[in-house]
């Protein structure tokens, strides 16, 4: 498309993340524009976050359905505060959702640009994938670092391992955490839907050691095999710093989404 600024490799983008808007929704809800994504509420959500002083907007995954006549990039204004927006494109079909590119929209000197990549893995077979994970740590992690933040998409946090045979702690056998540069203060971890296994919380705590924030946000609406909702009434996000949970309350709004704001100073 003419006029687009699209980066295929490291965007040379530098941001100091200080205030993060965290946005989630029920992914079964169809909005007034007919789509089960964020596109209907996105302009108002971004305006609200900008007014609240956020420099970063992190949306739960399955974020935007790409389609003819809808293109977010050229519509982004010169916000006073927002410098980075993270969303995932996806297909919404009768048989379920299919994830596409993860897209980082970021402010460059000459306007908004976009940087695309795909989730590298979710579940891990440690016997079969050790070499793959080592390559991810060495090659892919550097491409996910944007100034003071790094992005791990959904189950990529499984790149650190729960030692179920030994001391029952989390370890880093393939160097995924070690590959994140020391200057990174925030790990952004957008998620598709709620991960209920106990070790996911342990892995987020582990990744947050050393004073980093780990921000995870997911969609509500996940159902079990009997059709019962698995989310309950809890918040659709967690935040940890240095192994401890950081509370982030809901921001009241009438936009049909759930919003929290984290001061990562």
Predicted regions and their residues:
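Conserved beta-strand termini and adjacent loop/short-helix elements that scaffold enzyme active sites
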Residues: 23-25, 118, 217
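Active-site-proximal beta-strand elements of phosphoester/diester hydrolases
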Residues: 6-33, 147-158, 188-190
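Short, surface-exposed beta-edge/turn micro-motifs
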Residues: 54, 82, 100-102, 148-149, ...
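CN hydrolase (nitrilase-like) catalytic-core segments centered on the catalytic cysteine
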Residues: 62-85, 90, 97, 160-261
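Short, conserved active-site loops that position catalytic residues or coordinate cofactors/metal ions
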Residues: 16-71
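Acidic-and-aromatic substrate-binding clefts and catalytic sites of carbohydrate-active enzymes
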Residues: 31-38, 60-69, 94-97, 124-128, ...
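Active-site catalytic loop in hydrolytic enzyme cores
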Residues: 2, 94-185, 255-265
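Flexible, charged surface loops at secondary-structure boundaries
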Residues: 14-16, 47-53, 77-79, 143-146, ...
């Amino acid at each position: 498309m003419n006029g687009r600024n699209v980066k295929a490799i490291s965007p040379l983008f530098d941001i100091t993340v200080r205030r993060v808007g965290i946005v989630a929704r029920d992914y079964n809800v169809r909005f007034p524009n007919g789509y089960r994504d964020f596109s209907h509420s996105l302009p108002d959500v971004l305006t609200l976050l900008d007014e609240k002083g956020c420099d970063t907007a992190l949306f739960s995954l399955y974020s935007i359905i790409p389609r003819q006549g809808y293109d977010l990039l050229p519509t982004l204004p010169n916000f006073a505060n927002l410098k980075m927006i993270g969303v995932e494109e996806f297909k919404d079909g009768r048989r379920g959702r299919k994830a596409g590119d993860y897209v980082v929209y970021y402010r460059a000197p000459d306007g908004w640009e976009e940087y695309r990549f795909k989730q590298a893995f979710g579940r891990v077979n440690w016997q079969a994938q050790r070499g793959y994970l080592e390559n991810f740590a060495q090659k892919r992690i550097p491409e996910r670092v944007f100034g003071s933040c790094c992005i791990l998409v959904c189950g990529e946090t499984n790149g650190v391992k729960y030692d179920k045979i030994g001391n029952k702690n989390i370890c880093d056998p393939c160097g995924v955490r070690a590959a994140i540069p020391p200057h990174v203060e925030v790990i952004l971890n957008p998620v598709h839907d709620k991960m209920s296994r106990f070790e996911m919380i342990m892995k987020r705590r582990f990744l947050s050691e050393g004073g980093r924030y780990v921000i995870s946000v997911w969609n509500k609406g996940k159902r079990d095999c009997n059709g019962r909702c698995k989310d309950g009434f809890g918040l659709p996000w967690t935040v940890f710093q240095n192994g401890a949970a950081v509370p982030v309350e809901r921001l009241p709004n009438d936009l049909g989404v759930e919003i929290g704001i984290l001061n990562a100073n």
